[in-house]
């Protein structure tokens, strides 16, 4: 073993995320003075099958404190992995999974395990003196992802009457990530002015992910605002739309409650079909309830667009395998904190790619200044990244990191219209 990579110290602490809720930060230091730090995010609409964040459930922070998770890193995980070579990512992740011993990482907490997992990778990259994306992906990592920018919020992310959770723009006609960010930012500013004119200044406050939450009632109203803004910005041919329905949130007792109507699965499919016919929608995430593999298979067959599984798959290899067998969805939303280790997240991405599925590397609604997912999207050549509107520091941190990576790479390829299969 090259002793420069030996893990010399691990320190965990409680910090806060973009919603002011506590989360876990971990620092890993190697003997070669490689330093890696990671802060984990958390979601608002979470899948039932996600790995579990450990919360203290005491008075501090309204029960959301993470001191138990921090203590688990410092007193249980740390002694077990001190002295390990930081490049032994899979072995270290496996040790933590076995130490936890539960199927959903509920004993030590997925927030504790993931923070260590990511910090180890960063410390190894720093010791090797190479960027994280190159350390994780090697020299074949050169595809810059198309951003899915969540510019209008509904559902659990907003206080309006929109049932669908996210209305996103994708600058597929750009030629680079820096141009894509510029296009997205320009559309975002036009959208702000359009909303301001129609609904007044109270309608342009931003939500958790930097998007606006105007007082809208229907998806068509939101999509009309996007259409008008894209046209005014001059990007009709370059910018397309994506939706995150987060349908588990409006599903109850076998029915979907959308825009005041009680819909069956088939009626909801017709609703999506009509939207896709009317607007340039190229991707829909979680169109049905998280257990409705058949519904996902049906919409994937019926609509010639990207269908993304988030709550359906929760970045879990077993659930993804089931989806692949049933031809349910054709893309995976990759959230490292849904599964809890870097190794397992990469396994899920590789399984998706091998079976012709797209991969969208994603943030959470409760984010931090950590930029790991930007590097991960390039490392995997995922072709797509979902990291919010071009606003709020915890979102723009990822875009700025992608711009840095693009400049550093020199010869990179922007995924563009081939976002689902960039090769």
Swiss-Prot record:
Extract the InterPro entries matched here.
Answer: Enolase (IPR000941), Enolase-like_C_sf (IPR036849), Enolase-like_N (IPR029017), Enolase_C (IPR020810), Enolase_CS (IPR020809), Enolase_N (IPR020811)
One example of the protein's molecular function in GO is: phosphopyruvate hydratase activity
Task: Name the pathway.
Answer: Carbohydrate degradation; glycolysis; pyruvate from D-glyceraldehyde 3-phosphate: step 4/5
Which UniProt key words apply to this protein? Cytoplasm, Glycolysis, Lyase, Magnesium, Metal-binding, Secreted
Binding site residues for (2R)-2-phosphoglycerate: 165, 335, 364-365, 386
**Active-site residues, record numbering mapped to chain:** 209 (proton donor), 335 (proton acceptor)
Q: Which reaction does it catalyse?
A: (2R)-2-phosphoglycerate = phosphoenolpyruvate + H2O
* Family, per entry: Belongs to the enolase family.
- What does the function comment of this entry state? Catalyzes the reversible conversion of 2-phosphoglycerate (2-PG) into phosphoenolpyruvate (PEP). It is essential for the degradation of carbohydrates via glycolysis.
Q: What protein name is recorded for this chain?
A: Enolase
């Amino acid at each position: 073993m090259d002793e420069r990579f030996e893990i010399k110290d691990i320190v965990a602490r409680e910090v806060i995320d973009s919603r002011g809720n506590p989360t876990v930060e971990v620092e890993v230091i190697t003997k070669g003075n490689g330093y890696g730090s990671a802060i984990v995010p958390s979601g608002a609409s979470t899948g039932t099958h996600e790995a579990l964040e450990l919360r203290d459930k005491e008075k501090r922070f309204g029960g959301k404190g993470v001191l138990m998770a921090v203590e688990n890193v410092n007193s249980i995980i740390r002694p077990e992995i001190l002295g390990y070579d930081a490049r032994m990512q899979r072995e270290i992740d496996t040790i933590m999974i076995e130490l936890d011993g539960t199927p959903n990482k509920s004993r030590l907490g997925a927030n504790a395990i993931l923070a260590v997992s990511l910090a180890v990778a960063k410390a190894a990259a720093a010791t090797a003196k190479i960027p994280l994306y190159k350390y994780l992906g090697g020299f074949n990592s050169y595809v810059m992802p198309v951003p899915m920018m969540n510019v209008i919020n509904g559902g659990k992310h907003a206080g309006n009457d929109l049932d669908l959770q996210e209305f996103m723009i994708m600058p597929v006609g750009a030629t680079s990530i820096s141009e894509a960010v510029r296009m997205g930012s320009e559309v975002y500013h036009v959208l702000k002015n359009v909303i301001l004119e129609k609904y007044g200044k109270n309608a342009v406050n931003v939500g958790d992910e930097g998007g606006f939450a105007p007082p809208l009632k229907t998806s068509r109203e939101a999509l009309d605002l996007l259409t008008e803004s894209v046209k005014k910005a001059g990007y009709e041919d370059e910018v397309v739309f994506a939706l995150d329905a987060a349908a588990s949130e409006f599903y109850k007792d076998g029915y979907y409650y959308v825009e005041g109507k009680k819909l069956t699965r088939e009626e909801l499919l017709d609703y999506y079909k009509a939207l896709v016919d009317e607007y340039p929608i190229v991707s829909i995430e979680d169109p049905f309830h998280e257990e409705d593999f058949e519904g996902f298979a049906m919409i994937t067959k019926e609509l010639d667009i990207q269908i993304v599984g988030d709550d359906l798959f929760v970045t879990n290899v077993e659930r993804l395998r089931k989806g692949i067998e049933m031809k349910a969805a054709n893309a995976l939303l990759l959230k490292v904190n849904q599964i809890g280790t870097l190794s397992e997240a990469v396994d899920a991405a590789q399984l998706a790619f091998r079976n012709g599925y797209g991969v969208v590397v994603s943030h959470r609604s409760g984010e931090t200044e950590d930029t790991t997912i930007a590097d991960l999207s390039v490392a995997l050549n995922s072709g797509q990244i979902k990291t919010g509107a071009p606003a709020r520091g915890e979102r723009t941190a990822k875009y700025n990191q992608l711009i840095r990576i693009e400049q550093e790479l020199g010869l990179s390829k922007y995924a563009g219209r081939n976002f689902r299969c960039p090769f």
